[in-house]
């Protein structure tokens, strides 16, 4: 697993 990019709402 790797840090997923944070997607704004």
UniProtKB/Swiss-Prot annotation:
The keyword Secreted applies. It is found in: Secreted. The modification Pyrrolidone carboxylic acid is found at residue 1. GO terms for biological process: regulation of blood pressure. GO terms for molecular function: peptidase inhibitor activity; toxin activity. Its main location: secreted. GO terms for cellular component: extracellular region. Expressed by the venom gland. Keywords: Hypotensive agent, Metalloenzyme inhibitor, Metalloprotease inhibitor, Protease inhibitor, Pyrrolidone carboxylic acid, Secreted, Toxin. This peptide inhibits the activity of the angiotensin-converting enzyme (ACE) by a preferential interaction with its C-domain. May also potentiate the hypotensive effects of bradykinin. Belongs to the bradykinin-potentiating peptide family. This is Bradykinin-potentiating peptide 9a.
């Amino acid at each position: 697993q790797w840090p997923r990019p944070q997607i704004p709402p």
